[in-house]
Amino acid sequence: MLTVYDFNRITFAHHRGIVPPMPAQEGKKAVEKRYVCSANMKLMEYGYIMARDLFDACCKAEYNDFLKTWSALYDCVTEDGKAISQISPIWPNFPDDAMKADLVDLYVVNFLNYLTCGEWQPDFDPTKFCPALDRSHLPAVKQIPACDEEEIYRYSVQSITGHSPLSPDEASCVFDTLMHDIDFTSELMDRMKPKHIPCKENLALYVSRIISRPEWREQACFRDFKSSTDVLRLAAAMSDQDVSLSKAPKFRNFKRGERRQLLELLEHTDKNEGFALHPEEFKRLGERLHPGDYSYIFKEDYEIFTKIRNGVKIETYNSKLQELMKKPVNAELLSAHLMMRPGMFARNLDFALRNCSNEQQMENVLFRFISVCKSIEPRVLVQLINHFRNRNNPVHLASGKANGAASKALERDIEPLSEDICKRVARDIFNQLWQVLRAEDTEPKSVYIDPDCHCNKLIFPDNPRQVTSAVRAAACGSRTNLPDGNVLRAFLYWKGNDGPDLWNGIDLDLSVVFYGEEKAKFVYYANPKDETLGAIHSGDRRCSGKNGAVEYVDFDIKKCFQNGFRYAALTVKSYSGEKFSEMENAFCGVMVRDGKTGEQFEPATVKDRFALTTDSDQLVMVVIDLMTREVITVDKSVAQFRLACRNVVTDYAPTVAACTYAMQLKSLSIKEMLGMRYAQFLKSDDWKHASVIVSDEPEKFKVTDKDTPAPRIVSPYDIPGIYDLIFGKENQ
């Protein structure tokens, strides 16, 4: 059974704070304030601090209750540090001992460590200690506010009813961890009863967890199954398969009651389009559902399954569309046909425009689209605006829908559209979108954006499924500033089951690519040192071991830039071929250091931290602009042919392509999206009057007047929360 401490772990990870301990009962003594202060100081060592409301609530609790809450919170905060503290890199006094060694010694040490299956290390001075970390230039500590017990349900409802598929980690958290608990699911169903679920993938995952309950038909989402593809996704979810349908699902054997429920849902949907689009998948599903057993009840189901099994061609809207898209294209007829399905029009707007013979035809096509675009899903309009904003960028990446799908640079061979046309299309859709988002407002709403969040540099995640879980989860192309410090330390930790043969254990590699206009250098296991860049690798761990393994790469920002390298890309590669999702625990990131003080892993200096959980064996984390001192999120796996010796050198071209793609993006920012949703941006003096505040520092916005309602505060890194602000109907 889940406890409040389990809920706190989730709300803490999503920037929503924790539920504080209950106040001491009358006659019971509250904890002494000095204990709470000491606990808060301990948190600061790891880059966190209690917000005022949480601190005050802890001071009112009994000692034992406070200690339980504090211990659970401390476990969350110190999880990474505890994992890494059990191990050391190959060079125990890194970076000093490794930097003093010559290149031959570095190679020999790596080799000897490999021969001993990770046991042997070079001699080191056990009495040597690191000077205490200089805390004068650390990143701002992350505040932990108090939240109520309802917050975990708000998070779950916002995640499920959001307008976008959840990332694998978010989906696992909601549907596997939380909804695995019977009591939690019952409470959640009560709150979800009147809610509709616009995203069909989330609908399939949610219903698959509750379909065995007799009361599930009382849920409003029961009426959200509109097409046969929706039911196909549900069958995939019930079989623990990919609901994106990027891979053909393998259906399990369904119980008789489940077969009847699936067929009943299917009977009342539009079937032709889905069956024509996924014929093989429906053949396999039919083999599990046995529609012939229910032919007297679900006649339409039986007829369509019979057609698909016998190879009968099904005439659909799409079949007519395919005919109209054949060369030569009549843009007028095509756009007229597309108006019948606005969503399809959005998907094919670019095709229709580039096949127009003159500007007047373009005007007609665009006019027709604008006339129907208000009925299109808002998130699709966001993606369409981003498409036309970035259409003429030099580098384009194609990414699959599957978990961990690799991205590949495209050589585009399509008819051009002028930049003026692209800007015009994006602007016209933008003007329609803000009207859609504000359509149900009875009065203008206002928002205050904390300038320290730099929301104008944070890309709005139009596809959260592709966003890796992180301390500050951000979409590809988002930019944040580096704090003071001249040395960057990339880090990688992993722990997994090596198997009986440590010679062939799990081998992950941390690498850094330095590149400028016409040159590149690499610091990785085969080139562990470059003195001109002040760069040093901590050694190549070749297996996980019983406690995990760690690798670091240090480099000097000034030296890199002075030697003509403007960018540094941080990458992780599974050399042994295991996917990140197969690890027991794996994460990577970057710290900002002064090069003189602190332990090897100092949580308070962590700038970005990414969880390695996807079905991928490679990740480009971030690229750092050494001139502007900006960290640009890349968060892409790059596609490349499989090589036994594949490394950062062989992947240089796709890595740089992924970084270039991220840096050139002109997609909608979080600030632009908030501007569409809210009629007024408030100035700093007026934040108390805001409908909502977007900030990662809730302590700055505390209302002292008890009669004044406190504005809702949402972190820009809380993706379900941001989606609810912009697309939700209850976002005051």
Annotate each predicted stretch with a short phrase.
Residues 1-732:
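Intrinsic-disorder/low-complexity signal
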